[in-house]
Amino acid sequence: MGVANTSLRYSAFNFSLGRRFKSTSETLNDLPETISEVQTQLPSIDQMTNATADIVEQASHSVGELSTHIGYLNSIGLAQTWHWPADIIQHALEYVHVYTGLPWWGTICTVTILVRLLMFPIYVKSSDTIAKNSRIKPQMDKVTKELMATTDLAEGQKIAVRRRKLLSENGIKNRWLAAPMLQLPIAIGFFNALRSMANFPVDGFANQGILWFHDLTLSDPYLGLQFITAAVLMSFSRLGGETGAQQFSGPMKRFFIILPLVSIPATMNLSTSVVLYFAINGTFSVLQTLVLRNKWFRKKLNIAEVVQHPPDPTKENSGIFAAIKENMNTARERSEKRKLMKEEEERVHELIKKKRTNERIRIIRRPELKK
């Protein structure tokens, strides 16, 4: 019995051990099938890449939807006020972009043209004033020379009265001559507004360009916009400025030809959004100059004709730097004259004040005399 029990336990042990070895071997045999099943269930690298691209596209699409709503620029820290030029320009760009659906390059062009159209009546008045001044240029030059030559306060006042009378008789209000200077804060506003939008960058600036400048946040790689801007600036200066009536001397014409060429390296690192504004603004200036030089348009707009006077040969032969130096000397002389006349005026006022003090009569009543 004991031997039988021992043999039974031994056979049972062998049976269990065999089962264990058999189960381990079966597991190892099934391992490749399990790995293949896991590999088929996991996404491939291409699928993961496509999924990531879809997520990025959806995110950019959601941002693009935000940029087509009023208030987007304000939400990212731009267009914060309604009184600062750059903020006003950004508000205008946003309204045109949202309500017209134009891409950003078209929005910049549209807002630039709209602003210039609003300013066109001011340039009409300025052109008319310049033309009227050209009629009386010889008389005005004579009066101005007399005013610069005198140091007597009374005589200077008489000459100034003659000058005002001459302007009044010809219906000239020289305040319109400074009207085109309004373009300066507007240009600075456009520059700061577009530069801030490109530096952020605003959604759509990176892919809503046109032609060779698709990315409005980068500089023009071919400098095409810079050369266009320089060309139109030279054209409108040769045509008589934005009013179409300015008469530049020879040195000043050469100066305005060289200046746009200098602007090419100065603007080569600016974003294409900023230089696009310069190009469109300059192109409009050329068209405006052609309109204001046209006799039919001048007649319809009731603008006086420009009277051409022969230039001074001594000034015509001088160089650019000589002309600049002459203008600086003239400005300095005028400043010194104003200072001397102001000192003389203050001295006369002081003498009159002392004279009035000395001539003051004290009134004494009779009761005071009895005392």
Swiss-Prot record:
Chief localisation class: mitochondrion
Superkingdom of origin: Eukaryota
Membrane topology: Multi-pass membrane protein
Alphabetized GO MF terms: membrane insertase activity
TM annotation in the entry: 104-124, 255-275
Gene Ontology CC, one term: mitochondrial inner membrane
UniProt-annotated location(s): Mitochondrion inner membrane
Classification via InterPro entries: YidC/ALB3/OXA1/COX18, YidC/Oxa/ALB_C
Keyword Disulfide bond annotated: no
Keyword annotations from UniProtKB, A to Z: Membrane, Mitochondrion, Mitochondrion inner membrane, Transit peptide, Transmembrane, Transmembrane helix
One Pfam family per UniProt: 60KD_IMP
GO term, biological process aspect, one: protein insertion into mitochondrial inner membrane from matrix
Family: Belongs to the OXA1/ALB3/YidC family.
Summary of the function given for this chain in its UniProt record: Probably required for the insertion of integral membrane proteins into the mitochondrial inner membrane. Essential for the activity and assembly of cytochrome c oxidase.
Protein name according to UniProt: Mitochondrial inner membrane protein OXA1
Encoding gene per record: OXA1
